[in-house]
A protein has these predicted regions:
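The alpha-helix within a helix-turn-helix
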Residues: 2
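Amphipathic helix-loop-helix modules that constitute alpha-helical solenoid scaffolds
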Residues: 7-179
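Solenoid-like repeat scaffolds
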Residues: 83-84, 143-144, 180-184, 213-219, ...
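Start-of-helix register in tetratricopeptide repeats
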Residues: 90, 149, 153, 189-190, ...
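TPR/TPR-like alpha-solenoid helical repeat scaffolds
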Residues: 98, 158-159, 195-198, 227, ...
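Alpha-helical repeat scaffolds
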Residues: 132, 137-138, 169-178, 204-217, ...
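TPR/TPR-like (Sel1-like) alpha-helical repeat modules
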Residues: 238-256
């Protein structure tokens, strides 16, 4: 949970303890809300389900690089939400997003259990049935013209799913979508992801410049340093790239991710 919120574990522990005390003091009724109350609580529910999926997709710690049981449970919960609220755009958006990620599950690790980057995955093995289902859900959500962050993220994932390869992805449109996502949910992580698109739309130097102001917020985030390492290496700044890679490796808790970063350091 601390990793998901980019927070220190002691601070997150205190936040959780305070939340539990608040629930006990209020004698909170832990039951499924009435249908007319679902919309008011939806954002929090979707956020928790997405956190569960992300932990299953790439575990933050432990020996297992991925927790397929958690990812499957998150998809199942989102399908249940879809049954309860079949026309809700953000439920459609989250379900589409999770299915698009799930469509690549068979290609994310190689035969030795090593993490495979999106750029190197065998796209012929992606699950086209899940992609088609996700695209249908996303189309239904977008026709309602009630844009939300999960719909935008699903649209980004859909562009990756339809691209013939990594370099020929529609990075320009992805960059625009990250701008929209930043409007909806301002976050340094969104800006970091936008910098990935900038690398292919403008160039590595411009992308590196976009990451620099994010250092204060993301110094403890492994992917910040991993991205900067790749950008610095592309600019021939090898010593700085190695330093950034070492910082990313020190912050990574997932064994497969650590192995991938270590491989990059060995070159």
């Amino acid at each position: 949970i601390a990793t998901a919120f980019l927070a220190a574990e002691p601070a997150m522990t205190q936040r959780l303890l305070r939340a539990r005390k608040t629930l006990r003091a209020a004698d909170a009724d832990m039951r499924v809300p009435d249908p007319d109350q679902l919309a008011d609580r939806l954002a929090e529910v979707l956020a928790v389900v997405y956190l569960v999926f992300n932990e299953g997709y790439l575990a933050s710690a432990g020996r297992q690089p991925a927790r397929r049981d958690l990812a499957a449970q998150a998809v199942s919960l989102t399908r249940l939400l879809h049954q309860l609220m079949p026309r809700e755009p953000e439920v459609l958006g989250l379900l589409a997003l999770l299915l698009l990620h799930e469509s690549r599950a068979a290609t994310r690790f190689d035969g030795w259990g090593r993490l495979v980057r999106l750029a190197d995955q065998d796209r012929s093995r992606w699950n086209r049935e899940l992609i088609a289902e996700a695209n249908g859900l996303l189309d239904r959500a977008l026709t309602q013209r009630a844009s939300g962050p999960y719909q935008v993220q699903a649209a980004i994932a859909a562009l990756h799913a339809e691209a013939p390869d990594y370099e020929h992805t529609d990075w320009r449109q992805i960059r625009i979508l990250y701008d929209r996502l930043q409007e909806l949910t301002p976050s340094p992580v969104v800006l970091l992801n936008r910098a990935v698109a900038t690398r292919y739309v403008v160039g590595p130097e411009a992308a590196l410049a976009e990451t620099t102001p994010l250092g204060a917020d993301l110094d403890g985030y492994r992917l910040f340093h991993a991205l900067r390492a790749g950008l610095l290496a592309g600019l021939g700044r090898d010593d700085e790239a190695r330093e950034a890679s070492e910082r990313a490796l020190a912050l990574a808790g997932n064994p497969a991710e650590r192995e991938l970063l270590a491989r990059r350091l060995s070159f």
